[in-house]
């Protein structure tokens, strides 16, 4: 580890660089100059070190001081975080910690070619999540898919254009809105509930979830406990959050989300007496939602809806139907 107060004791060689908060190592195969390394199997292995250093520091400042994934007295104040660049064509990038002491990153050149370094923002998010445990401030549920969802949210905070830059996540999410919250199919696609929570409780609240998360809980249980919410109140909040996802009514990213507003569809099967039934393949799971587009009526028209929730219906997945419940309403856009 590199103690910033005793820099003369750090490992020094020609394949190392450092910033105020990071020390960067690269493998021997690169040679001494990351801007002009030997090719590997005909592929360029160049790394824009100045841009990497700049973005690392920018993300670090935001994750530490704005999102508060570290607090004063953290080991971050004593040690630089570590970045290891592997001379490899593998597409792997990994954020975590080194020896349970300080946040660290392991990356390859093909993951740091975009100028914005979205991959670095995501993986450094994992490093800061791990830092909470390194600092002895919490156990963060012992790990779960919520970590990926959070890293996407952290990336979205430092890059408001994330939905466009990684549009494949949006393309997937809009077909998976019915999935249960925290479903593994959506952990990379859907940081949107965290956006709602951050607005509702303040940005540092997400890091506090990690500090307070206990083994045996999941993030929903922790959230309810921290906010003294019963099941009914939590369901009301989730309904409100999902309504915001229709027109993306978030001030921070209002401009950036306009191309994705009001873009959902929902497969409905005609039923008897004029009813329409949500198809089994997109029927909502726990905290999932359907957004059903409606024709806009003439001004001054009254709009009514009849809704019937059916639990345990044949042909649909049914788990604990006795606990089923629904929220429904209109979203005017």
Model features per residue range: what roles?
Residues 13-19:
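Short acidic-hydrophobic surface loop/beta-edge motif
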Residues 1-11:
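Single conserved hydrophobic/aromatic residue that forms the stacking wall/gate
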Residues 18, 186-188, 297-299:
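Solvent-exposed loop and beta-edge segments used for protein-protein assembly and interaction
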Residues 97-98, 114-119, 134-205, 210-249:
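Acidic/His/Gly-enriched intrinsically disordered linker/tail segments
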Residues 216-333:
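Beta/coil-rich, acidic/histidine-enriched accessory regions frequently appended to metallopeptidases
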Residues 20-143, 150-151, 161-164:
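Juxtacatalytic substrate-recognition/specificity segment
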């Amino acid at each position: 580890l590199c103690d910033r107060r005793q820099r003369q004791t750090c490992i020094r060689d020609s394949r190392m660089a450092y910033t105020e908060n990071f020390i960067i190592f690269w493998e021997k195969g690169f040679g001494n100059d990351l801007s002009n390394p030997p090719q590997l199997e005909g592929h360029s292995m160049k790394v824009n070190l100045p841009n990497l250093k700049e973005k690392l520091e920018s993300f670090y400042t935001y994750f530490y001081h704005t999102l508060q994934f570290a607090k004063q007295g953290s080991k971050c104040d004593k040690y630089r975080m570590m970045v290891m660049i592997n001379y490899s064509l593998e597409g792997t990038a990994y954020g975590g910690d080194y020896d349970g002491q300080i946040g660290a990153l392991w990356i390859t050149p093909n993951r740091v070619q975009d100028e914005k370094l979205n991959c670095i923002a995501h993986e450094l998010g994992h490093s800061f999540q791990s830092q909470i445990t390194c600092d002895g401030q919490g156990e963060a549920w012992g790990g779960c898919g919520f970590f990926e969802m959070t890293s996407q949210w952290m990336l979205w905070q430092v890059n408001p254009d994330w939905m466009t830059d990684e549009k494949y996540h949006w393309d997937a999410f809009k077909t998976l809105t019915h999935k249960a919250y925290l479903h593994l199919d959506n952990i990379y696609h859907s940081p949107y509930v965290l956006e709602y929570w951050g607005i509702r409780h303040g940005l540092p609240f997400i890091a506090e979830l990690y500090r307070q998360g206990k083994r045996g809980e999941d993030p929903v249980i922790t959230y309810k406990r921290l906010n003294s919410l019963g099941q009914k109140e939590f369901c009301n909040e989730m309904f409100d959050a999902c309504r915001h996802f229709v027109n993306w009514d978030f001030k921070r990213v209002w401009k950036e989300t306009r191309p994705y507003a009001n873009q959902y569809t929902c497969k409905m099967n005609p039923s008897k007496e004029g009813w329409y039934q949500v198809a089994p393949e997109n029927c909502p799971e726990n905290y999932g939602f359907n957004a059903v587009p409606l024709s806009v009526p003439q001004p001054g028209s009254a709009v009514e809806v009849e809704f019937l929730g059916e639990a345990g219906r044949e042909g649909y997945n049914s788990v604990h139907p006795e606990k089923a419940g629904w929220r429904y309403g209109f979203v005017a856009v």
